Each structure stands twice: as structure tokens, then as C-alpha cells.
Amino acid sequence: MNNLPATPSPEELMTTPVFQAPETMSPQAEEASTALIAVVITVVFLTLLSVVTLIFFYLYKNKGSYVTYEPAEGEPSAILQMETDSAKGKEKEEYFI
């Protein structure tokens, strides 16, 4: 019967856990938690840095790389080729349903 927990005093029962005195941690546990927090912050920072770097390189490589499929200036053969292709397509059109 000696291993029963002690009954807390009425003052301890009246206070909320927020207002109770925090338990002190051992120095080793405090160092471990500090190291863990530092590692998490470092990983988050490196992840954000790598994402920003990838976005920068993507935007730099794709700068102005859109294709309009318009013929270049002074290429009449390209214009004629486009007109003949559209004429061939109007001769016989089949629709599969």
C-alpha cells in the first residue's frame, strides 16, 4: 500500500496546468531538445532555399521560350505550305464517333 500516489493539496487541485510551475529538465534533455529544434529549423531553411533555387533556374531557363508557330519573315514557302495543308484537309473529312 505504500506505492499509492500522494493526494495533491487543495491548492494544487485549484490551479490549472498552465499556472503550475513547470518541471525542470535535466541539462542533457535541454541540450537534446535545443539540438532537435536547431536541426528542424536548418532542414526547413535548406528546403526553402532549394525550392527557391529550383524556381529561379526554371524561370531563367524558360525565359521567352514560347513557340508561336508563325512563319519567319521572308519565307513565302511556309505560307504556301500552310495553305495547301488546309486545302487538303477540306477535301475529305471523316468523323469517327
From Swiss-Prot:
Q: State the family it belongs to.
A: Belongs to the SMAGP family.
Topology feature Cytoplasmic, residues: 58-97
Membrane-topology descriptor: Single-pass type III membrane protein
Domain of life per record: Eukaryota
The residues exposed to the Extracellular compartment are 1-36
* UniProt-recorded name of the protein: Small cell adhesion glycoprotein
Report the glycosylation sites: 7, 9, 15-16, 24, 26
Keyword Transmembrane helix appears in the UniProt entry: yes
Alphabetically sorted, this entry's keywords are:
Cell membrane, Cytoplasmic vesicle, Glycoprotein, Membrane, Sialic acid, Transmembrane, Transmembrane helix
Query: Would you tell me the Gene Ontology cellular component terms?
Result: cytoplasmic vesicle membrane; plasma membrane
What InterPro entries does the record point to? SMAGP (IPR043243)
Query: Which gene specifies this protein's sequence?
Result: Smagp
Reported function: May play a role in epithelial cell-cell contacts. May play a role in tumor invasiveness and metastasis formation.
- PTM: O-glycosylated. The O-glycan is modified with sialic acid residues.
Record bears the keyword Glycoprotein = yes
From the record, give the transmembrane residue ranges.
Answer: 37-57
Cellular localization per UniProt: Cell membrane; Cytoplasmic vesicle membrane
Where this protein primarily resides, as one coarse class? Answer: membrane
Q: In which tissues is it expressed?
A: Detected in brain (at protein level). Highly expressed in kidney and placenta. Detected in skin, breast, heart, lung, liver, prostate, spleen, small intestine, colon and stomach.
